[in-house]
Regions:
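Conserved "HGTGT" condensation-loop signature of ketosynthase/thiolase-family condensing enzymes
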Residues: 1-132, 140-239
Length: 239
């Protein structure tokens, strides 16, 4: 397949990143309190998965343009809500609200509602091996519509004991911000090999990508679909 890019062409701009990592066994009530106190959000009916996603995304939501797109990736939505739903079914007390709260796109819907956005709202199933796929999906969207801004997130609710829970979010668009802060995504130099951290579980894989971006100042990404190898590098002040 032909390369859709020119050498040194800036494909997209990564303006900012944010994350929320829950404390071990942090109760839902504490997460709801954080949303209420920090953002004035009544989160009483939201699933744990949605709480974790919102707490990571909302720090990036100030000053967003109208109708940003939302892309969220995870292996699944809310294991705890599914357990509760099955228990109520077994007890003959089914709850339609539990079902609606556990739909895979409930978190993206809630975030879009908070932002008042009618932009694209997409949930993507992903695991540790495919945690870069959502980024390429965003780049595909920006290739088609460069003027949009996208909130890209990776969120995870534990399905077993002693797993990390939380979410990581990037704010990406096709044009630079006036502050000239962040990174740009360009074609990697010829012969450059990607050097990505390897993890077998989802959230640690996403956290490692985000951590390497900040610790080393950039990332080298492998070819994927129509995309050649890409590089995320710090944005120069004059760009």
């Amino acid at each position: 397949m032909s390369n859709p890019l020119n050498p040194n062409q800036t494909i997209a701009y990564l303006h900012a990143a944010a994350r929320f990592i829950a404390e071990p066994q942090q109760p839902d009530g504490e997460l709801r309190r954080l949303l209420r106190e920090q953002y004035g959000i009544d989160a009483r009916r939201l699933s744990r998965f949605t709480l974790l996603a919102l707490l990571g995304a909302l720090p990036l939501c100030q000053g967003l343009p109208e109708n940003p797109a939302i892309y969220l990736a995870s292996p699944f939505s809310s294991p705890s809500r599914m357990v509760s739903m099955r228990q109520k079914l077994a007890a003959g007390q089914p709850s339609p609200l539990d079902f609606m709260a556990n739909l895979h796109n409930a978190a993206t819907f809630q975030l879009a509602q908070i932002l008042g956005s009618s932009g694209n709202s997409v949930f993507l199933a992903a695991d540790a091996e495919s945690c870069l796929s959502p980024l390429y999906a965003v780049l595909n969207a920006l290739l088609a519509e460069p003027g949009q801004t996208v909130l890209l997130g990776w969120a995870y609710e534990q399905s077993g004991q002693d797993e990390q829970e939380g979410s990581v979010w990037w704010k990406i668009s096709g044009s630079p911000m006036p502050q000239r802060q962040g990174w740009r995504i360009i074609m990697a130099a010829g012969g450059t090999a990607a050097d990505l951290p390897h993890h077998t579980t989802f959230l640690p894989a996403a956290l490692a990508l985000d951590g390497r971006l900040h610790e080393r100042g950039g990332l080298l990404l492998p070819p994927h679909g129509i995309w050649p190898a890409l590089q995320i590098e710090p944005l120069a002040a004059d760009e």
